[in-house]
């Protein structure tokens, strides 16, 4: 995944090759699920050019990127953490208005607890917030 945020305008551009879509969270609600990847993972050998996905962020928007190791993290009973639980936990944690690193830390701990503290797959979380337009140079 490659993402670029224009800090002056809030324009987010994303290319993904096999990772799940990102989520845009605004005022406590998921307002956009970024479209799924258009290119296959690099390791599959088939080369399709990725499509650049663009999203206009508003000041205060949060964006959550994650790998499938997050949503597929299984409990002892085999129940996946899932997208719904990911969204619910993230939205509730963001409502606590803690710094984003603390919110991400709590999310990772919730995922680890769900799978009895045994990491079963790659599990990456990136959480960002666009606060306001950057000043012109």
What are these language model-derived features?
Residues 1-137:
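Conserved subregion of the PPM/PP2C metallophosphatase catalytic domain
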């Amino acid at each position: 995944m490659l993402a670029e945020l224009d800090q002056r305008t809030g324009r987010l551009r994303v290319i993904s090759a096999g990772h799940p879509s990102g989520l845009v969270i605004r005022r406590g609600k998921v307002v956009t699920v970024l479209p799924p990847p258009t290119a296959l993972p690099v390791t599959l050998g088939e080369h399709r050019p990725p499509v650049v996905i663009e999203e206009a962020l508003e000041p205060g928007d949060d964006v959550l990127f994650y790998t499938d190791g997050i949503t597929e993290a299984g409990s002892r009973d085999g129940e996946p953490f899932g997208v719904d639980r990911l969204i619910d936990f993230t939205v509730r944690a963001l409502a606590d208005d803690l710094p984003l690193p603390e919110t991400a830390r709590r999310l990772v701990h919730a995922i680890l607890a769900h799978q009895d503290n045994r990491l079963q797959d790659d599990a990456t979380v990136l959480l960002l917030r666009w606060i306001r337009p950057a000043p012109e140079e």
